[in-house]
Amino acid sequence: MIAWFGEAEKGAYHTPYPISSLDELVGTFGHPPKFSTGLFYAVQTLLYDKSLLFFRVEEEGFSFNDYLIGLRAIDTIHTIEAIGMPGMADREIIEEIMPKLILHRQLLLFTEKDLYDYLTALK
């Protein structure tokens, strides 16, 4: 299972949604807002026949509280193989999640831009 965080036009905040089809994804979250990539990656996950858990955030990369609530909500779900947070390169959030990722042997999925932002912020 891959957990993605992202913006959407509908759906409750602070709730992890297990999604099994494209129809269910669109029915639950609607269309992605302009410049949002979370739903795009969620679609790719389903097209690659992977299980999906989607967590709606108010604004990708900026709704720190939404990310923290979401990370705590999915902390007990041990079937998650990877977590994707497009737009999120905040050092505090990444450092908080890293021990859990290592413990559960999960991957953190970055976009190239987010990885660059994270690495250059470390200097």
Question: What is the predicted role of each segment?
Answer:
Residues M1-K123:
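Surface-exposed assembly/interface segments
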